[in-house]
């Protein structure tokens, strides 16, 4: 994860996922780690993981259907490729 001074942890997490999505490392429809998994892997709280996912949703890079998890959005990837 990038260590950008002055940025909150949730923004750094979201920026890292943004880079993975836009580079194609994470594909459209691919499931992201759960809040719990993300928090454990990154040494953060679940609230921080939740904030990162909300920011990715706001950027339209991730879709989070209720009760199903978080997935890389199809529409944003397709728009970037056109």
Spans of model-derived segments:
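Extreme N-terminal segment that seeds HTH/winged-HTH DNA-binding domains in transcriptional regulators
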Residues: 1-46, 54, 58, 77-82
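Minor-groove-contacting beta-hairpin "wing" of winged helix-turn-helix DNA-binding domains
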Residues: 33-34, 63, 68-74
